[in-house]
Amino acid sequence: MVVKAVCVINGDAKGTVFFEQEDNGAPVKVTGEVTGLGKGLHGFHVHEFGDNTNGCMSSGPHFNPHSKEHGAPGDENRHLGDLGNIEASGSGPTAVNITDSKITLVGANSIIGRTVVVHADPDDLGKGGHELSKTTGNAGARIGCGVIGIAKI
């Protein structure tokens, strides 16, 4: 059974991101567009809470139910919410086109109800050697966010 979700991102960065999972255990396709980004890479993560009462800051840390270190999307040792980077050209909207086999839209570790956060800086994928590399990817300020909600199929 196909499950779909949507996230409307607000802040300095704005956009709409769609999530689609064909079946339980299937990869999740993440597509959409984000505007308001400077040229370059920007960290793109799912954070633990669907709470935006204090802007993006109340969304908590990266979604990490297995208590792992921060990493790249293809790493075995990564937070579930680690979706890597999106790349902005500096003009026009930035396309989001990610397929991830670790996140899910169903079950106990579903990302529905959690927050997508777009960061000001590149995610170093846990390999930057900075004190924040293994927790946040040293991706900088939270410049846009939105709660992931169930979408009509």
Curated annotation (Swiss-Prot):
Zn(2+) binds at residues 62, 70, 79, 82. Its main location: cytoplasm. Binds 1 copper ion per subunit. Cu cation binds at residues 45, 47, 62, 119. Disulfide bonds join 56-145. One of its GO terms (molecular function) is protein homodimerization activity. One of its GO terms (cellular component) is peroxisome. InterPro entries: SOD-like_Cu/Zn_dom_sf, SOD_Cu/Zn_/chaperone, SOD_Cu/Zn_BS, SOD_Cu_Zn_dom. Its EC number is 1.15.1.1. Its cofactor is Cu cation; Zn(2+). Keywords: Antioxidant, Copper, Cytoplasm, Disulfide bond, Metal-binding, Oxidoreductase, Zinc. Belongs to the Cu-Zn superoxide dismutase family. Destroys radicals which are normally produced within the cells and which are toxic to biological systems. This is Superoxide dismutase [Cu-Zn]. The gene is Sod1.
